[in-house]
């Protein structure tokens, strides 16, 4: 019985430390430090994150010669470093796997660098889907 309880606790703790699928309101709260940064509103960020990763902090997209990581799909050729692309510019000075957890602090720091260097158009979903009719991306439960 004791080993079953121990195994159950390990399973619970393991799940608690894993990345997760966030809700709209969780993303809204987590991204508060991005509000109006670079002229981009919080609803625009929530919309962009949804259309970029589906709010999945573990999202990984393999392209022909690069990989994109996390909630914001940050690319390993320029912004972060991984084993696939060890000669990355690594402008954010970070390992790409840091974008795969539910601590968005490092993601937000890199997003700000991306905004400063290339602007919001880095995220193709923004212009196409997140520049108008943003009321649906608000969270009433703050």
From Swiss-Prot:
Effect of residue 96 to G: In allele C, allele D and allele E
Gene Ontology biological process: defense response to Gram-negative bacterium; defense response to Gram-positive bacterium; lactose biosynthetic process
Superkingdom of origin organism: Eukaryota
Residue positions binding Ca(2+): 98, 101, 103, 106-107
Gene Ontology cellular-component annotations: extracellular region
Matching SUPFAM superfamilies: Lysozyme-like (SSF53955)
CDD domains assigned to the protein according to its UniProt record, in alphabetical order: LYZ_LA
GO molecular function, one term: calcium ion binding
Glycosylation sites noted in the Swiss-Prot or TrEMBL record: 64, 93
Main localization (coarse): secreted
Subunit annotation: Lactose synthase (LS) is a heterodimer of a catalytic component, beta1,4-galactosyltransferase (beta4Gal-T1) and a regulatory component, alpha-lactalbumin (LA).
Other noteworthy facts: In vitro digestion with trypsin produces a peptide comprising residues Ile-78 to Lys-98 which has antibacterial activity. It is active against Gram-negative bacterium E.coli (MIC=150 ug/ml) and against Gram-positive bacterium S.aureus (MIC=250 ug/ml).
Name of the protein this chain belongs to: Alpha-lactalbumin
Originating species: Bubalus bubalis
Organism classification: Eukaryota, Metazoa, Chordata, Craniata, Vertebrata
């Amino acid at each position: 019985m004791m080993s079953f309880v121990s195994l159950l606790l390990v399973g619970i703790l393991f799940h608690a430390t894993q990345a997760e699928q966030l809700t709209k309101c969780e993303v809204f709260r987590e991204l508060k430090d991005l509000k109006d940064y670079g002229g981009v509103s919080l609803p625009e960020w929530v919309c962009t994150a949804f259309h970029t990763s589906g709010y999945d902090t573990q999202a990984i997209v393999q392209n022909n010669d690069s990989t994109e990581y996390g909630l914001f799909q940050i690319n390993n050729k320029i912004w972060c470093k991984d084993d696939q692309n060890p000669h990355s510019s690594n402008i954010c000075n970070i390992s790409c796997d840091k974008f795969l957890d539910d601590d968005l602090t490092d993601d937000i720091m890199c997003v700000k660098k991306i905004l400063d260097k290339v602007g919001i158009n880095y995220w193709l979903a923004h212009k196409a889907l997140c520049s108008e009719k943003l009321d649906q991306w608000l969270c009433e439960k703050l």
